[in-house]
């Protein structure tokens, strides 16, 4: 199995990418990795090149660039070349911690959309209080969704949750403003009716306040709603930790309490860090394309590689294609 990784994408590239890749190589004996980027910079951190190949390029896509234009103009950019490795059959999947928009464009224009899938979805695994997490899609790839798009997201998310996350008969919920049948706008009502007859374990509408309680294993929504929910959860978690830190540092006695509580607080912080679950998968493409968090450290990159390897090994893409074909959606 071979995975191509954009070594220049992310806030801590290439160091975090290289260290994460070496960690994955040690863990998985069947894995080969191609690091795409500036060879001189990559080799500064590469202490072992066992089953690691470097594809040199001086070009990269900056986060400030317009995504589609950058992908079309910069054919030799590290992210584009990683996607090209997949298209050419040189890699089974690709990963990048670079620009989300650029990776979506590279996925569509280079890797290609799966036949029958109208719009791809961006899907991270979000944390829950019990540590199991849930898959959420879409969180920004498609802000103007149609009912058929969300139907397809539900099927793809269900396959992923079962194959990669090991959840038998995963619960699929539709993010809505209430749990009762008939709630929501016209899009929600149409999708609800379609999902009731889908070949999945549809548990009905779910509200955003219940997401972290693990009300569903897969949560489906349009990209606009999903992105707002994602950013709200991120912001709330950061604000709570910030307020907690301020209170714990407010007096001598509270500082003593903080010293005692620190190990438990670090466990809690790690549990709420969704980057530990891997990256956000771009569902609906011909091969696995994973968006690692922009601030990924080496452990986050390792988690994204582990996730990608599971998607390839468990044949997630062929399974999705087969299910869609059975549903006469292709």
Curated annotation (Swiss-Prot):
UniProt keyword Membrane, yes or no: no
Short name of any one Pfam family annotated for the protein: FA_synthesis
Pathway in which the depicted protein is active: Lipid metabolism; phospholipid metabolism
Name by which UniProt lists this protein: Phosphate acyltransferase
Subunit structure: Homodimer. Probably interacts with PlsY.
Described function: Catalyzes the reversible formation of acyl-phosphate (acyl-PO(4)) from acyl-[acyl-carrier-protein] (acyl-ACP). This enzyme utilizes acyl-ACP as fatty acyl donor, but not acyl-CoA.
EC number: 2.3.1.274
Subcellular location: Cytoplasm
Family per similarity comment: Belongs to the PlsX family.
Gene Ontology cellular component annotations, sorted alphabetically: cytoplasm
HAMAP family xrefs: PlsX (MF_00019)
Domain of life: Bacteria
SUPFAM superfamilies per record: Isocitrate/Isopropylmalate dehydrogenase-like
Catalytic activity: a fatty acyl-[ACP] + phosphate = an acyl phosphate + holo-[ACP]
BP terms from Gene Ontology: fatty acid biosynthetic process; phospholipid biosynthetic process
Gene3D superfamilies in the record: Isopropylmalate Dehydrogenase (3.40.718.10)
InterPro entries tied to this protein: FA_synthesis (IPR003664), Phospholipid_synth_PlsX-like (IPR012281)
Lineage summary: Bacteria, Bacillati, Bacillota, Bacilli, Bacillales
Keywords for this protein: Cytoplasm, Lipid biosynthesis, Lipid metabolism, Phospholipid biosynthesis, Phospholipid metabolism, Transferase
UniProt GO molecular function: phosphate:acyl-[acyl carrier protein] acyltransferase activity
Transmembrane portions of the chain: none
Organism whose genome encodes this protein: Bacillus cereus (strain G9842)
Record-linked NCBIfam families: plsX
UniProt KW Lipid biosynthesis keyword: yes
Family matches, as PANTHER family: FATTY ACID/PHOSPHOLIPID SYNTHESIS PROTEIN PLSX (PTHR30100), PHOSPHATE ACYLTRANSFERASE (PTHR30100:SF1)
